[in-house]
Amino acid sequence: MAPAELALTLAAAGAGSVLRYLLGGWVAHRMGPEFPWGTLAVNALGCLGLGLLQGAAPHDRALLLVLGSGLLAGFTTFSTLMLETANLATAGERDRAFSNIVGTLALGLFALSAGARAGAWAAG
């Protein structure tokens, strides 16, 4: 990795983290604390974005690095998903914990697939 690519990827990852914090917090505030909607939203949007990127530019190494491994990796959060799911389960909210895991996986796979198809279509 060239120094410029490293710098861009680091900056993009930082920007993704800030965007996750802002969007996740906004969604959580709007939807309420009963379910981790903010994390679900950022992870689904991240999957959609990665699908779009992979579909539109599957061989553009620099773009995949900066936007995929940088921005979108900083934006999405597996660890928060696990923590929020564990918190729901230990609070006796096992149905919500299960819904969080299954819903995130299903929505993430759907968003990734839809994004990849849309990206490939847009790229021609």
From Swiss-Prot:
Topology in the lipid bilayer: Multi-pass membrane protein
Q: What is one GO biological process annotated to this record?
A: cellular detoxification of fluoride
- Give the reactions, separated by semicolons, that this protein catalyses: fluoride(in) = fluoride(out)
Q: Transmembrane segments in this chain: where?
A: 7-27, 35-55, 63-83, 101-121
Which molecular-function annotations from GO does this UniProt entry contain?
fluoride channel activity
Can you tell me which family this protein belongs to? Belongs to the fluoride channel Fluc/FEX (TC 1.A.43) family.
What role does it play?
Fluoride-specific ion channel. Important for reducing fluoride concentration in the cell, thus reducing its toxicity.
- Name of this protein: Fluoride-specific ion channel FluC 1
What taxonomic ancestry is recorded? Bacteria, Bacillati, Actinomycetota, Rubrobacteria, Rubrobacterales
